[in-house]
Amino acid sequence: IQLYDKPEIDGVFSLWYGKGPGLDRAMDAIRHANMGGSSKNGGMVLAVADDPIGKSSTLAYQSEQSLVSAGIPIFYPANVHEVIPMGLQAFQLSRFSGICVGLKITADTADSNAVVDLSSLRPPNIGLLQKEKVHIIQHEPALDREETLFTKRIPTAKEFIYQNKINKVLRDTNKKHLGIIAVGKATTETIDALDSIGIFEPSKFGIGIFACKVPWPLIDKDIVNFLNI
């Protein structure tokens, strides 16, 4: 919208969806979009359906490598309950930082169903002031766009993720002997595995679990805080 001299609307949110092979085909356009940036009242979210065993895709696929190569943050819901809240957070992050945001959904999550209570869902309190000029502008040279992405948008995105506590410490103890960092769906599987061997309250055994919902960019302050508890 900000590329027009006299736009007729304030902003547009866009949601792209595709499986892994579709992401491969679309990477040229996606890379250009992320280098250009979103408008201040817009937002771009890429919902990528990963099929790691090739159940219903032409190839087994993991999307992280492609998204990271384009400088796109990755949100990874652990289950059906997290898809909508994290999707809304992804849109807010995109609008705030001017960056595209990936939403990774694995086949196990996409093929499952659940009753989800959204009555308490509220927009996150950003609580941040915009410090940098991160949104798309007219006639920005290619090298300037790349510099903006890596020196302004990604640091802004990292601060948003940290301040809004998107990554979570699920179970912890002050006497931790073992810290488990689980990414996305592996968080649920880790808890199920501990339950299966009778460890229903990991903290009693000195075990802490950190749910990494944004595997890239990794928020080092979140990891340090978890390890220091």
Residue ranges and their predicted role:
Residues 1-95:
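Thiamine diphosphate
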Residues 77-229:
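Flexible, low-complexity linker and terminal segments
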